[in-house]
Amino acid sequence: MFEHTTVLLKETVDGLNVKEDGTYVDCTLGGAGHSEYLLSQLSEKGKLVAFDQDETALRHAKEKLADYEGQVVFIKSNFRYLKDRLNEIGITKVDGVLFDLGVSSPQLDTPERGFSYHHDAPLDMRMDQSAGLSAKEVVNEWPYEDLVKIFFKYGEEKFSKQIARKIEKAREQSPIETTGQLVDIIKEAIPAPARRSGGHPAKRIFQAIRIAVNDELRVFEEALLQAIEVLKPGGRVSVITFHSLEDRICKSTFKDMSSPPELPHGLPVIPKEFEPKLKLVNRKPITASEEELEHNNRARSAKLRIAEKARE
């Protein structure tokens, strides 16, 4: 069963300031928790477009949202094609967009998907299982320098060089096929004192490989700009991130687009075209309450940022 506990449910959807006859986009349908709550606030004239590139997630979401048939358009696509896919169904402007980034619990909990360092499974990590690049290719075929680069950049792993060197030596003997093999190699490469602190030793490397396989940061950066573009003035975008790399992209995009430009002193008024495109709804990110954390520990690293479109 595709069981998934939705993070920051009310905060994310209520933050969109939902209009009952509005058009909304859920870029990360997943377990459909946010979508279901959003749809419950729409009248029959309201509409939701729901994106997911995971076939299993879409199938379960269609069952879960069966009561709203006719109001939901399901799109199997990476959200980097947000604007194009909306154009294809005749939608150019929307009232709100939401992103809930990171891997959904069912993907983590299904061993054969290869996302989890707790289960031995084939190295995969593709969000879209019809996509080309898999974790197995990254681990076995990418040169040492490229592995160091992604481990450091996407995993913020201080033992990147040691781990990449161990991977290189191991794959010379035979291909690294499973998550279990990779975990053992990582553990061997990290000094014992460091292994005993700071969570699971493979956590950062698995995150780095997953980001590389799915091109997550670039995809999010592109999609966030498209989301802001398709918003009507007064429309809002809610973004939940789970690690500092994504949060940095969201924070800097929102900051850049909500800050007035440097203008010559003495201008009586700011010309309209120089006014910021966005207005921040919350200056500091919203995090999960103690009550939510008791029920869902995965919400611990979640940060929610919301912005409103001020002008075209």
Swiss-Prot record:
Gene Ontology biological-process annotations: rRNA base methylation
Database matches in NCBIfam families: 16S rRNA (cytosine(1402)-N(4))-methyltransferase RsmH
Family per similarity comment: Belongs to the methyltransferase superfamily. RsmH family.
Molecular-function GO term, any one: rRNA (cytosine-N4-)-methyltransferase activity
Name assigned to this protein: Ribosomal RNA small subunit methyltransferase H
Catalytic activities: cytidine(1402) in 16S rRNA + S-adenosyl-L-methionine = N(4)-methylcytidine(1402) in 16S rRNA + S-adenosyl-L-homocysteine + H(+)
EC number: 2.1.1.199
Species lineage: Bacteria, Bacillati, Bacillota, Bacilli, Bacillales
Positions that bind S-adenosyl-L-methionine: 32-34, 52, 79, 100, 107
Record keywords, A-Z: Cytoplasm, Methyltransferase, rRNA processing, S-adenosyl-L-methionine, Transferase
Enzyme category, top tier: transferase
Region of interest called Disordered, as start-end residue ranges on this chain: 285-312
Subcellular location: Cytoplasm
GO cellular component: cytoplasm
InterPro entries per UniProt: RsmH, SAM-dep_MeTrfase_MraW_recog, SAM-dependent_MTases_sf
Function field: Specifically methylates the N4 position of cytidine in position 1402 (C1402) of 16S rRNA.
